[in-house]
Amino acid sequence: LDTSTYEINIGQGLTAQTTAILRFNPHIYTRKNNLIAKVGFSMQSDINDNAKFYLFPDVEASYSLFNNVFIPYAGWKGNVERNTFNKLRIENPFLSEDIDIKNTIQRSNLYAGIRGSMSSNFTFNISTNIDRLDNFYFHIPDTISSIENKFQLTYEKVTRTTILGEVTYQNGE
């Protein structure tokens, strides 16, 4: 059980936001020969002015080939991702103080890839994933402010595709 809460008091006014995310994530791991599988689910709640509850899959499988030289893997999961004023302000220091902060809901994250090691010093990971996201934020100009030098947030539903390639070389033992 994972819980986290935070409260934001912004500026001199009465703007305050309190939210909490509660997570319950039971799962089972199994291993048979070179196959490793995880099957479970994640129940999460996004509690702010009103509470919303989500049920996400949490499954992953990998299979070791050639003594861990190649490990194909795939999975499917979801998550409630916390957005904080500090995180948003680091991305854009010109953010208006009176923004409505919503957590991003990762409804589905399907991913697959191949990782492995060619030697004790050299590892790699190549993967792709497709995310379906609700409340994904974008920065837009704040046309209401007097000198229009601030940004507001707008939230949209998006589908995001990511391609990742990693190569690691570790010199030493």
Describe these PLM feature segments.
Residues L14-A20, A51, T159:
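Short, contiguous, pocket-lining structural segments
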Residues I36-K38, Q44-I47, K52-E173:
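Exposed, low-structure sequence patches enriched in small/polar residues
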Residues I8-I10:
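Alpha-helical repeat-solenoid motif detector
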Residues D2-Y6, T15-D46, E173:
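Surface-exposed extracellular loop regions of Gram-negative outer-membrane beta-barrel proteins
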